[in-house]
Amino acid sequence: HCLGREDEIPEMGDFFTAQLLNEPLLVVRGEEGIVRVMANVCRHRGMPLAEGRGNTKRFVCSYHAWTYGHDGALLRAPRMQNAGFDVKGCRLPEHKVQLWNGFIYVTLDPDEPDFEHPELDALLSPYETGSFRLVHMAEEEWHTNWKCLVENFMEGYHLSVVHPRTLHGYTPTGLSRKLVNGDGYTSYAANYPDSIEPRGHGASGLSDEERKRSTLFAKFPTQVASQAASLLVSLS
């Protein structure tokens, strides 16, 4: 599952919180720039350790002041020294993270292998997707099946019918072309007509053809994105 972009937490101690399948998550950049995703739950009485986003030197539980480092290690548990409690043996559960093209992905399955999408990597490489920076973010919760988002986003067939005065003029149904697909992903090109200018110049390695289209991809089950020359939009 895609949680966001690496540049949301550029500095050591930057963090944001998220929820995945009723699991409260804490996404933090720690020492040496390492990005971790941990359980956002104190090991003592289950209180949330953080809310929203920000920057902090330590995560301190608001209930009993148990204190954790950026790596999830318990640093302090007040008045527990006489209870036979091993502070060094306690830490926040950590989930498996993979960074790809500037995105942060997490899985709750520790045995899930890292994904590899060489054909999709080759498709996005000229755009330098990993170098894009977040300029706007909006949060909504949709009570729907994940396939509704993916199936609607990943086809241009409906554009002429549903969006005749907006998207169809920029990315006509008739110019949509299927691109690469593989295990866990698919993609297509929304090509612009000759009358439409590219969306910015973009990276120096882009061809004229790549500047004249939006490259859309889906990483199943929960992420869809549109990459243009100077614009990247992602939903997850």
Predicted regions and their residues:
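Residue-level detector of functional hotspots within protein domains
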Residues: 4, 47, 60, 83, ...
